[in-house]
Amino acid sequence: MKVIEVLSSSKESWEDATQNAVSQASKTVKNIKSVYVAEQSAVVDGDKVTEYRVNLRLTFEIK
């Protein structure tokens, strides 16, 4: 197994940011087995959250 760190963001939610990271990573990394959300943050403009950010660790199997 190998672990890589991935940063991702979304205008919608932390869940969407996580899915975006997995979708993008799976284009070049095969056999992703799990994702661990290490950090969550958000960008705020005025009184609105404008961007959700996640710092993830993706675990994948090396064959």
Specify the residue positions occupied by each region the protein language model found.
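Soluble periplasmic/extracytoplasmic beta-strand elements of cell-envelope proteins
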Residues: E5, Y36, N55-R57
